[in-house]
């Protein structure tokens, strides 16, 4: 009963979290895949006319003119970022920028990969508990469900030692980050281990560039989770970023779900108070071990595991660097020449100014950089 699915009346971004862990939002094809996917490489991108968020055609030139002095956070009306947004920046920052500017261009091949990966994640989650659908109609309801999940998962972890799909949220350089940890469990030695599942189309481990992205992702999960259990995340910060109305009454479906879980609440504020109290009193430890498990999609065979060494200074430095783009203090950057092979499977290769300019971003694409305060 720990995880839910929202009605279409509430967008995925309204909740702050996805239904499944965000580990499968983005899957990049290997270099070998690129060599076999000429149709994908040559597929026309949004180079001439694309559909905007209001479903009206927009030309690339008009899109470029829309880039002004607003920061990406302001321009895209973002209240927070997903962990995978920063993980994608680790792969190619410019791809992240194009994805926000021109959404909806995911190639069919990649969409199929995501569907398969999500199915495997769902099957794993169902091994531990059933799913309950709770209809919601407001962003407050959606966040209430996530708070309820946290309240239910914390005692389950302490009593049974194993949970999946744990929501996390916290600040990084003044920006709210949200995500969902795939799995948490205690080892035989009593250490808290984070396990992240990654599915592979081919029966082989990923290239180092992909591993680098994955390692940063799980490190960021630990960075946020540890801050939550150490009391470094505050209700005031969450309210400031999300603009949630704590006094708004919860919907009837959410209230029923709360009562079934043993919680007598009326508003989001009631739940938020319980969540932060639970994080404080549960005596949850910080995460001791970070593990990534790679499995083959077709056969479910484990291809290998990676134990990630958490380097807090390095994580902080990367977060600071990536947030500088989102806050408008610098231009988005493409990949280095040595990693230009990534462009072979990029949906935006045909319009990429970085690629066309051999690593120099066109002034028509780059927003005016704000000076860091």
Curated annotation (Swiss-Prot):
[4Fe-4S] cluster binds at residues 92, 343, 346, 352. Its main location: nucleus. Binds 1 [4Fe-4S] cluster. Its cofactor is [4Fe-4S] cluster; Mg(2+). Its EC number is 3.1.-.-. It is an enzyme of class 3 (hydrolase). It is found in: Nucleus; Cytoplasm, Cytosol. The keyword 4Fe-4S applies. One of its GO terms (biological process) is interstrand cross-link repair. It comes from the Eukaryota. InterPro entries: EXOV, PDDEXK-like_dom_sf. One of its GO terms (molecular function) is 4 iron, 4 sulfur cluster binding. GO terms for cellular component: cytosol; nucleoplasm; nucleus. The keyword RNA-binding does not apply. Mg(2+) binds at residues 182, 196. Keywords: 4Fe-4S, Cytoplasm, DNA damage, DNA repair, DNA-binding, Exonuclease, Hydrolase, Iron, Iron-sulfur, Magnesium, Metal-binding, Nuclease, Nucleus. PANTHER family: EXONUCLEASE V. Single-stranded DNA (ssDNA) bidirectional exonuclease involved in DNA repair. Probably involved in DNA repair following ultraviolet (UV) irradiation and interstrand cross-links (ICLs) damage. Has both 5'-3' and 3'-5' exonuclease activities with a strong preference for 5'-ends. Acts as a sliding exonuclease that loads at ssDNA ends and then slides along the ssDNA prior to cutting; however the sliding and the 3'-5' exonuclease activities are abolished upon binding to the replication protein A (RPA) complex that enforces 5'-directionality activity. Belongs to the EXO5 family. This is Exonuclease V. It comes from Homo sapiens (Human).
């Amino acid at each position: 009963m720990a995880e839910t699915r929202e009605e279409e009346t509430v967008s995925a971004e309204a909740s702050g979290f996805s239904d499944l862990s965000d580990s499968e939002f983005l899957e990049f094809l290997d270099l070998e895949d690129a060599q076999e996917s000429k149709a994908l490489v040559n597929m026309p991108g949004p180079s001439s006319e694309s559909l905007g968020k209001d479903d009206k055609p927009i030309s690339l030139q008009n899109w470029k003119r829309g880039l002004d002095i607003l920061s990406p956070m302001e321009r895209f009306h973002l209240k927070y970022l997903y962990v995978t947004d920063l993980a994608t920046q680790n792969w190619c920052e410019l791809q992240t920028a194009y994805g926000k500017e021109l959404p909806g261009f995911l190639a069919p091949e990649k969409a199929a990969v995501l569907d398969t990966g999500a199915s495997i994640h769902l099957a794993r989650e169902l091994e531990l508990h059933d799913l309950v659908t709770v209809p919601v109609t407001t962003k407050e309801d959606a966040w209430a469900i996530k708070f309820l999940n946290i309240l239910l998962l914390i005692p389950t972890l302490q009593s049974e030692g194993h949970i999946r799909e744990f929501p996390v949220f916290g600040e990084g350089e003044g920006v709210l980050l949200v995500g969902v940890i795939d799995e948490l469990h205690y080892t035989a030695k009593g250490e808290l281990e984070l396990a992240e599942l990654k599915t592979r189309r081919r029966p082989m481990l990923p290239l180092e560039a992909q591993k680098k992205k994955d390692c940063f992702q799980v490190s960021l999960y630990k960075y946020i989770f540890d801050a939550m259990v150490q009391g470094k995340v505050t209700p005031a910060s969450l309210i400031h970023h999300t603009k949630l109305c704590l006094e708004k009454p919860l919907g009837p479906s959410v209230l029923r779900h709360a009562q079934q879980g043993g919680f007598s609440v009326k508003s989001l504020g009631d739940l938020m108070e319980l969540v932060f109290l639970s994080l404080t009193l549960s005596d949850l430890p910080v995460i001791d071990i970070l593990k990534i498990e790679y499995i083959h999609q077709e056969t479910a065979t484990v291809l290998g595991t990676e134990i990630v060494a958490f380097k807090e200074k390095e994580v902080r430095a990367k977060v600071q660097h990536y947030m500088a783009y989102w806050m408008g203090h610098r231009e988005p950057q493409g990949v280095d020449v040595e990693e230009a092979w990534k462009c072979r499977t990029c949906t935006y290769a045909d319009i990429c100014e970085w690629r066309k300019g051999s690593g120099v971003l066109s002034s028509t694409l780059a927003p005016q950089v704000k000076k860091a305060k």
